[in-house]
């Protein structure tokens, strides 16, 4: 049984999350076309202004991580107390979704997320895709 503090992060279905700083947003960004990425980059550059280079660096790192390891991370970037991993799932109808695992950083340190959990998440996404959903 998890301690009560382990269940503090509650998210409702349909909650909107920032693309640039969450593992869910980053996973989605890594799965879309280059053309779509450019459209999103332009929109976020206008939205974030002087903060855009930092946000873009996070997206670029996520893309690198995804290409090398099959997952994206957000280590305290969306919320300084939350670490998360994300992977895209491609459905047969062309829909792209993100599968994520997030937890308080004191329960799941970055090393555990990067070294174990994120890899398992990527394998789970592959299993789901192989079901032909």
Protein language model annotation of sequence segments:
Residues 1-43:
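Amphipathic alpha-helical effector-binding/dimerization core
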Residues 29, 33, 118, 122-129, ...:
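Short amphipathic alpha-helical signal-transduction/dimerization elements
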Residues 40, 111-113, 133:
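Short linear functional motifs in flexible/disordered or boundary regions
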Residues 44, 51:
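Acidic, glycine-rich loop-and-strand cores that form catalytic or ligand-binding grooves
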Residues 52-127:
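Extended hydrophobic
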């Amino acid at each position: 049984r998890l301690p009560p503090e382990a269940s503090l992060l509650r998210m409702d279905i349909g909650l909107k999350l920032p693309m640039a700083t969450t593992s869910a947003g980053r996973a989605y960004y890594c799965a879309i076309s280059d053309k779509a990425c450019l459209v999103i980059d332009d929109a976020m550059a206008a939205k974030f202004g002087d903060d855009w280079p930092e946000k873009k660096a996070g997206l670029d790192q996520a893309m690198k991580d995804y290409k090398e390891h099959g997952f994206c991370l957000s280590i305290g970037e969306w919320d300084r107390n939350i670490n998360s991993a994300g992977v895209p799932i491609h459905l047969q109808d062309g829909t792209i979704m993100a599968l994520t695992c997030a937890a308080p950083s004191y329960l799941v340190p970055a090393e555990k997320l990067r070294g174990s959990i994120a890899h398992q998440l990527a394998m789970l996404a592959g299993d789901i895709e192989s079901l032909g959903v």
